[in-house]
């Protein structure tokens, strides 16, 4: 029972560290996301990167233009079948327990192939977290690069075993090839899923509803139905369960046996596995719903002057929200008992690359934490309610923005558009660091802008010049004078309504796009 024993050992060995520091050595008083679960959730979330869907639609239009809408050409039919059989896949590249790459499949390349192109020999001794078990074509290359460990989500693999196309036996043959590569390679190919710590789901639900983005909506639109958040969360749960779970338990067992996890098909291992997967999907859906596509809210400039300059142009709202959810996930690794903050830095190259993220590439990320290597009792943890200023935390905690800059894996290039996504407004100490690093855009909430608190102030953000600031707010352009319930989409800085027919199928597109 190798795989089952493997999961048990990992769960017991790491359960105590699931509330650990940057170094995994400290235990806190609030539930925290383990690094393994964080990397797993980010891989699932990267599978949903919006740019991939746009590429798929563009490719479909191009193919229809070449072959006609019926696709009666035999070669066209074969290619279409192959693409339906290959599932979109997200990937997180980790080195020394630090994230050095966030990737997803593109129209032409699998996630593992993209990682090899982007990182090359630097993949040596890295850990890779896939949202699906990689195919043999990817596995042989990344194993050859000398990776340390490959973890994957134990559901339908990259070469789908669920689609009708798999009846050709190609998917089963690929699964056998993957198992042979696994058994004869130095890299450890495994499933790393840990049970969430006690009260983690409840904690995420409470903090997601109370986060700056949801609270800004309720304050700006006091007449809005307060159930909108919970309705969107339920929609996301259904959508993600369709994507990341195999609804039929017997079919799930069949897939597990085919991909070499037959020992997980027996209870209690199978029931525990599915429960852990459901809990993580619930957590992901909850966090994703905290930055909702709601009416005319999004990340906008308060004063849209010089909007035509490239560094002042906003990202499409779908991508901005996606990146902010990445930061929200990172915030659940916080060591601050009061306020969890996450930050992620991306940059946009001059031309579209092979990655499913298009021209955008990952630079760095972080969350607020105490210095690396610290133990729980090394530093004070009290906030400004403590009268004795000597035992307050603010002199010792390192903010998320600073950790993102410190542990970045790419240099920030002055000629490129770089952007940081922060779950809360940057404080007066972080603002000059962001500007000094050469970051061109800041995406954040504005609930604390202009406030001065006991130990920290947020006065500089509003006065900051030379960096474009996109804050979560109701669209200031006045375009929301349309029907209040009419959906919207912001593409390339232009706000336009979504046709009713498109709106009705918006949630289904991600599910349909993976087959």
Swiss-Prot record:
Example of a GO cellular component annotation carried by this entry: cytoplasm
Catalytic activity field: 2'-deoxycytidine + H2O + H(+) = 2'-deoxyuridine + NH4(+); cytidine + H2O + H(+) = uridine + NH4(+)
Cellular compartments annotated: Cytoplasm; Nucleus
Top-rank EC class of the record's enzyme: hydrolase
Span of the annotated motif Bipartite nuclear localization signal: 489-511
Basic and acidic residues: compositionally biased ranges: 60-83
Pfam entry (one): dCMP_cyt_deam_1
Chief localisation class: cytoplasm
Positions annotated as active site in the UniProt record: 401
Protein's name in the database: Cytidine and dCMP deaminase domain-containing protein 1
Naturally occurring in which organism (per UniProt): Pongo abelii
Gene name per UniProt: CDADC1
